[in-house]
């Protein structure tokens, strides 16, 4: 369909403001909403939306689609879940600025932190740019979805300081150079800056942003606001609560010094802190100080899949396991099968700490050999007891029989208390976000949280009203993130819209598919119930799947 003229008739309109739904038509011309109500004019293209919900397109504020947008301008499967705008470049990582040779370090950080592999980069990410603006120019022509792109603090630091970016504080001159890059990037269309207090690189050394002082962060945030907008996104040191609370306080200082909106994720419900009480109290303290600091929370359980053929953050805490997981697949198989190495691996698994301590909570998912069929759906602790084996031995025996492809699942542990999750989703101290879509792709699919919210929390359990859910996914984040030209169905706003059947909308189980460049695999979550997704006036997805429209913009 052309974006020149379109009318959607007889819709139940949920306009994003939080008011009650109302019936009406919406007319679009040249990508802009022209009329709402009883549209009498005849348009080139018309959609009958009787019995369907028409809402603003959803905004996903935490994604890592930076590489994927080089070959997939739809950021699949985001659009089929009603998402019309994604924010990329989170957690201090972006693909620009970059100097010749600098891509190797960027790739290695993306591999470890975001689980996007080097063969994928080699096959589909050309690194034909240097500046952030040049990267945006590279992805623009192919966009079917809107992109709000953050500049990665680690990328900027690496560009200016090289190897020293992971050794020391920046000098005043280096800070000025970084600020100049941020200003120029913002002028080229960037949305803000991202940083990290917790991430590590391929050598388990802190990423460049973690070597910055508060002065550097404040100056970069101030540079980002010179265009009249800007956000400062971080991932805190969530491993230790005391440190995380200090991070939140520093965000408050940055906001108060510069006026920038600061945001961090994830804020999750855990068994020992169902409503994230300490974090929410820290957020309230900063709000009381006058700082603009928001958490990000999500509706789904934070479930993880582990395959020894891929990557797993559950193994990072065990050095021998981690070292073997870093090997090419053929060497990895030999190492895991080696009797002497197995003794070390089994001992490490017995004494696992951090995220690796969750290994006993795993159960067996998909299997690929006949002998492993008896284990499907069973918890590893159950198998250990039945067979008299240690946890490490059970994992190795099962995985080796499947050529390392066995799926081990960690489910219903984090963010599983639905009452507490409802509280967090509804709390004004948090934004709806933290999906991590486009990252950790061999461990989970972050895309689809929008559909899960509608299906479970709005329709099935009625814990959240439809108007409130839509408002939280659209106008609220659009306003706070500086996307003032969209996020609401109003005359003169961008025609980013989603049409769906609330009685049919739903999400599939995760599927492990092999569709990434470089023969890489990823988890996907498919949707149902979406009749049309419209980006800047053009239908990019309908009942027949994706169209050929490329109407996305840098926002």
Please give the residue ranges for each predicted region.
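Divalent-metal coordination cores built from histidine and acidic residues
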Residues: 71-192, 226-227
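Histidine-rich, glycine-flanked metal-binding segment
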Residues: 2-6, 13-57
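Di-metal (Zn2+ and/or Mg2+/Mn2+) metal-binding site signature of metallo-dependent hydrolases
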Residues: 54-77
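C-terminal cap of metal-dependent C-N hydrolases
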Residues: 423-430, 447-449, 498-545, 549-551
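Acidic, glycine-enriched loop/beta-strand segments at the rims
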Residues: 14-25, 407-415, 421, 465-470, ...
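Divalent metal-coordination and catalytic microenvironments
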Residues: 11, 31, 51, 62, ...
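Active-site neighborhoods of metal-dependent hydrolases
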Residues: 135, 143-144, 150-157, 163, ...
